[in-house]
């Protein structure tokens, strides 16, 4: 960015100055290993080493580069720096740099070189030119490195923005992020309830009543063509789809499950309509009531058939089913008990001529098949099924 203050040349060149200083191999050997010289040369060389150790190359370049921060250094510091930077070419000739601050330190690089090429005399103009070139080079490197890192940051920022655009709801959505997926189920919340009220095929999922019958079933129009299809046939004229379906897959040989229930215009051959029972009212079966109803066969039609004097054409409630042993139910029409030792389920005895309640009429209009090993719910406070009443009366 153009608003930032660019780093100075000395900051950028600090590491290179350190490397160049240690690669120049400054003389740090003890006195015994130096070549024999005059005593004054030993002292001057020692002073030169001390001055070189206190003056870093960075400070030398600041004084020669004209940055203004170290203007107190004179050309002696330039000569001192020439001796530091050129010792690799001129051997160990640093004997003339004893007084580096007096401005007159002569013979800076005329040491005892071992046949090397004479070094170029460093002037302030050459050092300034070198510093300018190196500063441009270092600033260029700095900008390139900053540019690469800036491009990486921009790419990562763009990718993050794209991810937010893909995952966010967008400007056209009215919901927030938390409600982003709620539209998929808000409209479907009432669908199971509507299916219960409109198409109540309970247990078999629409199999019992051939796709489900309406809530109000006219039992006089219920077709009995599916009643003689076996023990596990389809529902009683479509009532199987409403009350629970029983086993609506048709195990008794009925190839088409809904064949007998789909047409309600067939003439009724129900066993109660054959016996001239007044069962013309509609039965209102509520959808939440789920009781498995199985169809009776023609063999067991005499078990549940009760004389029509015990029925009253009243509006019905839900039928409650009792457990009736098959032997007692079979012996009820003939009046003979084939199994006298078997205890009867009901302790209370109702007179068959007693006028039944409205629930008895509902139970009478729903033809039932009582299995021998199945317990049916029987609250004894309400009533006894007419077949049970007849069976207990015959006993």
UniProtKB/Swiss-Prot annotation:
Region (Disordered): 27-120, 164-188, 194-213, 250-274, 332-361
Gene Ontology terms: cellular component: nucleus; perinuclear region of cytoplasm
Chief location of this protein within or outside the cell: nucleus
GO molecular-function terms, A-Z: transcription cis-regulatory region binding; transcription corepressor binding
Any GO BP: negative regulation of transcription by RNA polymerase II
InterPro entries, alphabetized: Period_circadian_regulator (IPR050760)
Protein localization: Nucleus; Cytoplasm, Perinuclear region
Keyword vocabulary terms for this entry: Biological rhythms, Cytoplasm, Nucleus, Phosphoprotein, Repeat
PTM text: Phosphorylated with a circadian rhythmicity, probably by the double-time protein (dbt). Phosphorylation could be implicated in the stability of per monomer and in the formation of heterodimer per-tim.
Bias kind Gly residues: ranges: 93-114, 201-213, 250-261
Task of the protein: Essential for biological clock functions. Determines the period length of circadian and ultradian rhythms; an increase in PER dosage leads to shortened circadian rhythms and a decrease leads to lengthened circadian rhythms. Essential for the circadian rhythmicity of locomotor activity, eclosion behavior, and for the rhythmic component of the male courtship song that originates in the thoracic nervous system. The biological cycle depends on the rhythmic formation and nuclear localization of the TIM-PER complex. Light induces the degradation of TIM, which promotes elimination of PER.
Complex and partners: Forms a heterodimer with timeless (TIM); the complex then translocates into the nucleus.
Protein name, entry field: Period circadian protein
Species this protein is from: Drosophila equinoxialis (Fruit fly)
Gene this chain is encoded by: per
